[in-house]
């Protein structure tokens, strides 16, 4: 049986890093494209056994080099709010290189829960907040399906738990960092469907190691849905710190949502939210990490947020 070689995009990041580590544990050879091979994250990845290639997604020659001999690709592209076309351009460059390689038979794309369903959103239209974000995800999903690659899988993770840790928390929940308040545009009854990003890596690695078992599967990923009060309760329990739970009023939300992408996404969660069929996930032999367990595992990082 030939060696599985996976080109993992974003391998020094959260989802890509989790995927790379799971694959390396499974004996899969990992190729990673990195802007700076001397960075700590790149060196740490190399020490685990990954083969690093310098370059980026705008450079076809570096993509070709990283794709050399690969039999599988994990695709995870970050959106760029300052250049809303960049995500699709990067995905196209990678998929084109995947097809041109002639060796890749498996592609796994990490999208987002609710991708492709944007036209169902209330008041959907060209001026819908973050319309470009949802259209880009749907377009990339279509590119993956139409790539002609023998095996393909689309993963759609919900809200990732690492957003409650630094450095993400300083942007996503700035008042949580200081003055230790959970101040949101969420409604008290809004339930946020969450997921440990490491579990994306487990699913992605499984789809690469056993591609026929996951072929043409489009999997919404989430482990549980928690209200703001439940999230605060768990953060307080693990940290031993008191956290104030606060909500913007309707007028404040309207004003902030005009310019703040973070508030826009919270309003979207109130109106739509990440909808995951937890029962459907039980057919897969992968155990998902619950929020309480995740926070316990990352207790020291939680304490840094609430220092």
What are these regions (language model features)?
Residues 31, 51-53, 155, 244-248:
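General small-molecule cofactor/ligand-binding pocket signal
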Residues 43-70:
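Conserved Rossmann-fold cofactor-binding substructure of NAD(P)-dependent oxidoreductases
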Residues 2-43, 58-61, 78-89, 97-106, ...:
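Oxidoreductase cofactor-interface core, primarily capturing Rossmann-like NAD(P)-dependent enzymes
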């Amino acid at each position: 049986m030939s060696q599985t070689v996976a080109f993992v995009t974003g391998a020094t990041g959260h989802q890509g890093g989790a995927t790379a580590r799971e694959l390396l544990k499974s004996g899969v050879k990992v190729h990673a494209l990195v802007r700076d091979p001397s960075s700590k994250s790149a060196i740490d990845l190399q020490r685990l056994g990954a083969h690093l290639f310098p370059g980026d997604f705008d450079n076809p020659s570096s993509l070709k080099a990283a794709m050399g001999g690969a039999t599988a690709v994990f695709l995870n592209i970050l959106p760029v709010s300052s250049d809303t076309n960049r995500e699709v351009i990067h995905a196209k460059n990678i998929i084109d290189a995947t097809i041109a390689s002639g060796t890749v038979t498996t592609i796994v794309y990490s999208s987002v829960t609710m991708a492709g369903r944007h036209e169902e959103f209330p008041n959907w239209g060209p001026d819908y907040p973050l319309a470009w974000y949802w259209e880009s995800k749907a377009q990339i999903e279509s590119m993956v399906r139409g790539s002609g690659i023998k095996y393909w899988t689309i993963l759609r993770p919900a809200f990732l738990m690492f957003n409650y840790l630094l450095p993400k928390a300083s942007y996503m929940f700035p008042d949580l960092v200081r003055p230790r308040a959970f101040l949101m545009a969420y409604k008290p009854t809004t339930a946020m469907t969450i997921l440990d990003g490491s579990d994306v890596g487990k699913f992605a690695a499984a789809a690469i190691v056993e591609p026929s078992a996951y072929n043409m599967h489009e999997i919404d990923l989430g482990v549980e849905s928690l209200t703001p009060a439940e999230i605060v309760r768990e953060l307080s329990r693990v940290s031993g710190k008191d956290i104030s739970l606060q909500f913007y009023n309707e007028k404040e939300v309207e004003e902030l949502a005009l310019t703040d992408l973070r508030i826009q996404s919270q309003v979207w969660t109130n109106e739509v939210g990440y909808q995951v069929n937890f029962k459907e996930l039980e057919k897969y032999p992968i155990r998902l990490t619950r929020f309480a367990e995740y926070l316990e595992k990352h207790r020291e990082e939680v304490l840094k947020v609430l220092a």
